[in-house]
Amino acid sequence: MIELSSAQPTEPISLHWILPPSKSLMARRLVLSALRGEELPSLEALSLEDTPEDIRSLLQALQKSREGSAVINVGESGTAMRFMTAYLSVAASIPCRLEGTARQHDRPIAPLVDALRSLGADIQYIGKEGYPPLYITPRTLHSTEVSLDVSLSSQYLSALFLLAPRLGERVDIRLSSPLASSPYAYMTSSVVSEAGYQWQEVSEGHFVYEPCSDVAHAADHSLLLAEADWSAASYAYALVALLPLGTECYLPQLVLPSLQGDSRYLPLYMERLGVYTEISEEKIRIYRGEQRGGDCFEADMSPCPDLVPALVAALVGCGVAFRLRGIGHLRVKESDRLEVLGSEFAKLGVSLGIGQDELYWEGDLGEPRVLLSPPIIDPHQDHRIAMALALMTQRVGRLRIQAPDVVAKSFPSYWTQLGKLFTIKPL
């Protein structure tokens, strides 16, 4: 456990945050490179301080597979679980078991398994039907038309897109549901296209792959670390929203325009809370100006669900009522994020409304509370809950976070960055 405390500055300050490399871009480029049979980078080649645990888990899983391991464990990484399911179905050297943590085994994977089976994959459930762990025997996939339910995760579609180097014939994918987190799927399509493989969206929800012989050169591993993570940047934006007018924060390696979907929404949403974005070469400067928001902030967050925790912290911290829709699939993340956001903000005297597909708040902080001891936040092993709630230190003065190491999943140096403003001590 750690305790955070803030002097709650009243004058503008200047911050400089080092963000981790883009987790979503790194994961896709690693898997695509592996499926093309290219040499994988070593863990030593990546910065251990900045490389998200998700990426380390994925890279270790790919390396284990190439070494002929019969058991692949991806830990907490949902990204690795979904991408490795597709990868192992065609590229494993021997039949193997794919597993993770207990929470990982509660996260559904049936839509992806069903789609892969329709392509000829041999995947069996070891425990509960529709959930990991899995037993996968590699097969050559064949041409077919695939129906895919993507209501819970766009990574099901991304996993299929990444298989392009191993598809020898035309494949049609038809979506049977609205696409959750759609920018991530289009990012995958763009990454695959960079390597010379083209998925065409011939009509809404209908994607076609036609093999071609003209593909790009081997992957450039320097691209893995070239661009900072926009989801991680949301915590810097949210923090600046809670600080005095004139506060600024420099974010090196954050790029606009970017393939990362969150880059399209975060600056727009945070501008309504008075955080403005200034673009310069190889860095972005954000600064605190006047708020532009109205009485209530409303948004469909289905394209950018990873922004929800930080955005909720910023909105509550600024006292702005909100209604965020299109987020029912957050219930099957590292935690049930809707319920956990509700329970942990309640410890700060904030009563969030929780629907099946939405989160809302009337902007009422209730009666002022005298906190005799700092609230203790339980992130429920969810990195984004820990990072978002920690920001509320700026409002309550002192806060304790259980299991702080959970942030390593996406932002290993988060406490180092936050320590540039808050005092942080282990307990």
Language-model regions, residue ranges each:
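Short, structured segments at the rim of ligand-binding sites
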Residues: M1-L427
